[in-house]
Amino acid sequence: GRRVDPAALSGSLVITPTANPLGLDNRTKTAPQDLQDLDQTFPGNPQGMVTNHMAHALFQEVRAVASCLVNMHTMGSIHDSKPYCVYKVFPGSAVTEAQLLRMTSFFEPSVSCRMDVGGAGELPGNIA
């Protein structure tokens, strides 16, 4: 596998092995407590149900230290598939598509899917 050279970093690197432990433990995409998909609840809501609480807490922690988030996915009934990435391209962003792809390539995704997001409901910034 690839290794990160701390001397080559020009920022912070935060790695969370799993963002959705409730779904992982249940072997589903959704949390059994509220049947919500964590990926679809970002940035979360501290007044919402348990999945919204998790999304809010995680998003606030990452947002405080990151200019870009690499969000890898897997799927399959036992989460045994190859990782993939959906990357978001925002109009006027300081982070280029080439930079996003370079960041995701470190994780060797089986596929990277581009998503143009300029709608009013999307958060500003880059999420890969």
Where does each model-flagged region fall?
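Structured catalytic-domain cores with a bias toward divalent-metal coordination
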Residues: 1-128
